Amino acid sequence: MPEAAVKYQPYPQIVLPDRTWPSKAITEAPIWCSVDLRDGNQALVDPMGHDRKARMFHLLLDMGFKEIEIGFPSASQTDYDFARWCVEEGNVSEDVSLQVLVQCRPELIARTFEALEGAHRPIVHFYNSTSELQRRVVFGKDVAGIKQIATDAAKMITDMAAKAGGGYRFEYSPESFTGTELEVALEICNAVIEIVRPTADNKLIINLPSTVEMATPNIYADQIEWMCRNLDNRENLIVSLHPHNDRGTGIAATELGLMAGADRVEGTLFGNGERTGNVDVVTLALNMFTQGVDPKLDCSDIERIKEVYEYSNQMVIPERHPYVGELVYTAFSGSHQDAINKGMKAIKQANKPTWEVPYLPIDPRDVGRSYEAIIRINSQSGKGGIAYILQEDYGINLPRNLQIEFREEVQRITDEEGKELPSKRIHQRFIESYVEQPGARIKFVDHHTYPAGEHKGLRVVAAEITDGGETRQIEGKGTGPIDGFINALSIYLGIELSVADYSEHSLQHGSNAAAIAYVEVEYPGGKLFGVGINTNIVAASLEAIVSAANRVLDVVGK
């Protein structure tokens, strides 16, 4: 790489020692304007045809956008025709303003008004580039010449609007604002404001675009606060942000710009746009939502938003994209899974509406996602994640020691295969290892109990089992079926077995609900779990003991 200090110059700092934005917070949603159908569309390899545009347009209306930039009708017949369709057939309610873009050229402005005929309070958005670089390299004009372009356009647009009977709104953008000296941007904007003469009933939108993101977000915030302080007739202006994402900080720049006094944001769904994209309004809205602020945009069906985005733009959303990517609500790490598992249990038990789950800043259900993909299992996963999947998907609530034991078995599989284990496979392995145990030596068949005669309080458990497929009758004594049955198995197998831990719960609800029993059996070499499932809880418990005994036999080699 070349020497950075020689080839690139740092962006100048803004002198604003009394800046106030760092102590501000976002407490209400801005005015949102979608520019998907203009800025977004112009950045596509294959620009949208009518059907793709119409589908995007209806989604934006359904989401609650009140301002939608529908195109550049003076630039192409396609955009002109779509603008007429929106006006005539778009079913646009009167609280929604259609916005169109136009350069500061007389013939383009005239065509723009033709495209908007019949629209309710549309926004005519005119712009010209004001940056020092473009003045010098592209236009060869001084500040006065660039200002003249803007003021001539402002005069023509306001005159044409008056001749058309009024009802128009106006927006002016000093394009490449972040590359323009603040004093120059202010001079040009104030000249436009003087011509448009905005009022409380018809405010002028002054859009301050980060056409190319050139510096850190705090500098953009300083620029916005400085402009908000110095613009003429500020009370009758709507200061708008239009950030891009060249440095990867478009979201942060927008949030700081709102803290600095801006009222409005132009952006696109999931940040589609030229180069690295426009600011992502979905992420912005959901960032506000997770801070307790109503974003005034409906993102409750994020899968539909994603589907329309991918259809209309012919682009795929990355798996890690905030709030919408396939993996953003998923944990593979063992420690993360354990924390999520405990957090989900805690929130179920807590009697309050506040969302508090580690590693999940938003409840996936709030955007139409389920809990199914929160935890997925691979070689990095831990006992908490495995326990969560079995609990959520199958109602199996593993005791802690069984979580540890079964995790080792799952770990062996993931290490061998080197890939993710789906929920169904984990459940299948659990049932095979602990319940069905194909090929196991001992199987439980039946049992009955009767008093132990001279031993008051004890009962004899007479049980039928199979050993290698052959029927055997065994007997043992104990205070109940579990105690007596493990005594019988100990005698029969010649291994001292005892119950170290026992728990059970129902798997379903109702009179025919199956019960699942977990029994941890201690033997001279350690402890192992067994699991039984049966509609009879006693039978489930005895099956669990047999399950554990078979695992002991595997270990001791009998």
Curated annotation (Swiss-Prot):
It comes from the Bacteria. Its EC number is 2.3.3.13. Mg(2+) binds at residues 39, 242, 244, 278. Pathway: Amino-acid biosynthesis; L-leucine biosynthesis; L-leucine from 3-methyl-2-oxobutanoate: step 1/4. GO terms for biological process: L-leucine biosynthetic process. GO terms for cellular component: cytoplasm. Its cofactor is Mg(2+). GO terms for molecular function: 2-isopropylmalate synthase activity; acetyl-CoA C-acetyltransferase activity; magnesium ion binding. Gene3D superfamilies: 3.30.160.270, Aldolase class I (3.20.20.70). It catalyses: 3-methyl-2-oxobutanoate + acetyl-CoA + H2O = (2S)-2-isopropylmalate + CoA + H(+). The keyword Amino-acid biosynthesis applies. Keywords: Amino-acid biosynthesis, Branched-chain amino acid biosynthesis, Cytoplasm, Leucine biosynthesis, Magnesium, Metal-binding, Transferase. InterPro entries: 2-isopropylmalate_synth_dimer (IPR013709), AIPM/Hcit_synth_CS (IPR002034), Aldolase_TIM (IPR013785), IPM_Synthase (IPR005668), LeuA-like_post-cat (IPR054692), LeuA_allosteric_dom_sf (IPR036230), LeuA_N_DRE-TIM (IPR039371), PYR_CT (IPR000891). Pfam families: HMGL-like, IPMS_D2, LeuA_dimer. Residues 30-303 form the Pyruvate carboxyltransferase domain. Residues 437-558 are annotated as: Regulatory domain. It is found in: Cytoplasm. Homodimer. Catalyzes the condensation of the acetyl group of acetyl-CoA with 3-methyl-2-oxobutanoate (2-ketoisovalerate) to form 3-carboxy-3-hydroxy-4-methylpentanoate (2-isopropylmalate). Belongs to the alpha-IPM synthase/homocitrate synthase family. LeuA type 2 subfamily. This is 2-isopropylmalate synthase.
